[in-house]
Amino acid sequence: MAVVTMKQLLDSGTHFGHQTRRWNPKMKRFIFTDRNGIYIIDLQQTLTFIDKAYEFVKETVAHGGTVLFVGTKKQAQESIAAEATRVGMPYVNQRWLGGMLTNFSTVHKRLQRLKELEAMEQTGGFEGRTKKEILGLTREKNKLERSLGGIRDMSKVPSAIWVVDTNKEHIAVGEARKLGIPVIAILDTNCDPDEVDYPIPGNDDAIRSAALLTKVIASAVAEGLQARAGVGRGDGKPEVEAAEPLAEWEQELLASATATAAPTEAGAPEPTTDPS
């Protein structure tokens, strides 16, 4: 069964790249065409790469690995936190702190401090202190919670990272590559594919696109966790809310993809030839 369908990708605007004057030439092979000065991503390739990334994430988690979800841009913050939390994985959706991976021993000490402050607050450890001291400790706790709350239970560097917008998260990507940690990421038309091990060509600026692809990765994690626990496979297809009707040209793309897929796999739910 298809992990995600061409229709879902189109509904989410995953096929829209950047303006033609803002692009990385290395992305040329992932571009289907351009329309009104906007690059249109080849969603047929997107589907293929989604399957590869999905399988990698599923197998990584099934064998005891963890995936760190990273997306600090406004459009990704909510879905990154929600999907990572849904499958019990660590996440960073606020500012990436330099050294979060390459200097994890120091970060781990800050996590211990966060837990210490939380325990103090919950067990009355703030009692007997001056208002100024309590205020200082509370501010310290809140600051740590804001920057490290998503990785509070991460005891070691992750097995892989999922990234929304590799340009914005270039520090995270650089640290992962330095440590040999596989990078799975959305590749918009202004990104560098050489920095990513498991690319998914797509729109990393639209909220719906980032949410859909993040949900796909989280579903792969969920399936990996099921395999690890010896539970049967569930339906990995992510649910998507109803979308705006497709434009006529987008309907043509979908029809073209479906028509091409039909002879190959009759009745297969996954379209096979779509531009974007």
UniProtKB/Swiss-Prot annotation:
Gene3D superfamilies: Glucose-6-phosphate isomerase like protein, domain 1, Helix hairpin bin. The keyword Ribonucleoprotein applies. Residues 255-276 are annotated as: Disordered. PROSITE patterns: RIBOSOMAL_S2_1 (PS00962). This is Small ribosomal subunit protein uS2. GO terms for biological process: translation. One of its GO terms (cellular component) is cytosolic small ribosomal subunit. The keyword Transferase does not apply. One of its GO terms (molecular function) is structural constituent of ribosome. Signal peptide: none annotated. Belongs to the universal ribosomal protein uS2 family. Keywords: Ribonucleoprotein, Ribosomal protein. CDD domains: RPS2.
